[in-house]
A protein has these predicted regions:
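Signature of N6-adenine DNA methyltransferases within the class I
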Residues: 3, 10, 70, 78, ...
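Flexible phosphate/Mg2+-sensing switch loops adjacent to catalytic phosphate-binding sites
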Residues: 9-58, 81-101
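Conserved SAM-binding motif I beta-strand of class I
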Residues: 60-63
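Conserved SAM/SAH-binding beta-strand->alpha-helix loop
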Residues: 66
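Conserved hydrophobic/aromatic beta-strand scaffold that supports enzyme active sites
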Residues: 232-236, 321, 335
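C-terminal segments that line or cap access tunnels to active or ligand-binding sites in enzymes
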Residues: 330-338
Length: 348
């Protein structure tokens, strides 16, 4: 993210430098394109040309928990800096003072949820926060990750039902308070669905946070051999007043909207909160079908039959199991249901 952001800003900066030189020389774009790279510009006194680069990798800060990824990020920024420097030299048509690896890179190794972000960069020098936090569901976290959630959301209602990515929204919101800093995060779309909306966004909105723009659900795609099978959203949020119009992106289209609520809809901020008691005289509901065993107790028809051949007494403990795919395709799987199996039977 830092590398792509740096490259985008430097490309914009190069375009600005090119336009300023054209304006000073009184030439059009077509005339500029006729100038060869080998021509030298004489009599240069414009500071824009003498010192054309204002965007530096030293203005970018990052926190990465993995040491190898941190090293890769540093190297990528150095390479990007060198590439963009060459492009700038072609524009100003003169060599620039540049020594590879001379610039220091502010990539710090550590747990971003336990590091004080102001120890990395004081918020008075910070303009934007962006990131692609880990995608880990509320029921799939490690003990360390669950401890991060409990620490950051101490005192929050239903914090145990929040996905891991919600920690970055909370951490960024705390840092942005009473500043002009703006944030944008890529997240699983769970942060804008179900009980996460009331659990996360209601307290944040009450604390003065608002959503500036959002990309509604899209499928995450990459060139990696093992692609992440997740659906994502991008949410830009801040606490400072924003004179710009709010924009909601969906399916390649952008829409100017009055408000963006926690469900990423152009509606008022309403919240559907969980209840443990029904509104009328109807039976209470339970959790229902919730397979979070890692698939260890789920069997296909063939797997179930092979298991029963080895353990015939297990036949009575197999129950048909239907999820959405099994129901639609009429291809049931089986669950080894040991809730009624006594310890003595298990020992046989």
């Amino acid at each position: 993210f830092l590398t792509e952001t740096y490259l985008s800003l430097r490309r914009m900066e190069n375009e600005i430098v090119r336009s300023l030189i054209d304006a000073r020389e009184g030439r059009t774009k077509d005339q500029r394109d006729q100038i060869t790279a080998g021509q030298i510009m004489w009599g240069i006194t414009d500071s824009t040309v003498l010192e054309p680069i204002k965007v530096s990798i030293q203005q970018f800060y990052g926190i990465e928990i993995n040491d190898f990824a941190a090293t890769v990020a540093k190297t990528a920024l150095w390479i990007a800096e060198s590439q963009m420097m060459k492009q700038t030299e072609e524009i100003v048509q003169m060599p620039l003072d540049f020594l590879p690896l001379k610039s220091y890179v502010n990539i710090f190794e550590g747990n971003a949820l336990r590091v004080d972000w102001e120890s990395v960069v004081p918020k008075g020098r910070l303009n934007y926060i962006m990131g692609n936090p880990p995608f880990v569901g509320a029921r799939l976290m490690s003990k360390e990750q669950k401890a991060d959630v409990n620490t950051l959301f101490a005192g929050w209602k239903n914090a145990g039902n929040l996905d891991y990515v919600c920690c970055w929204y909370k951490k960024a919101s705390d840092l942005m308070r009473d500043t002009a800093i703006r944030s944008a995060l890529v997240s699983t779309n769970s942060v804008s669905q179900g009980e996460s909306v009331a659990n996360l966004w209601k307290p944040l909105f009450e604390a003065g946070i608002h959503i500036d723009f959002a990309y509604r659900t899209f499928r995450w795609d990459s060139e990696a051999s093992q692609k992440a099978h997740v659906h994502c959203v991008i949410i830009g949020f801040s606490s400072a007043a924003n004179p710009k119009e709010k924009v909601l992106y969906s399916g390649g289209h952008a829409q100017i909207v009055h408000n963006i609520n926690g469900y990423l809809l152009d509606m008022d901020n309403v919240f559907v909160e969980s209840r443990n008691k029904p509104l009328c005289n109807v039976p209470e509901i339970g959790i229902g079908n919730k397979p979070i065993d890692g698939g260890n107790y789920l069997f296909t028809q063939e797997e179930m039959e092979a298991f029963v051949q080895k353990e015939p007494q297990a036949q009575k403990y197999f129950k048909p199991w239907y999820g959405s795919q099994e129901f639609i395709n009429r291809c049931p799987r089986y669950c080894l249901w040991l809730g009624e199996c006594t310890p003595s039977e298990l020992k046989k």
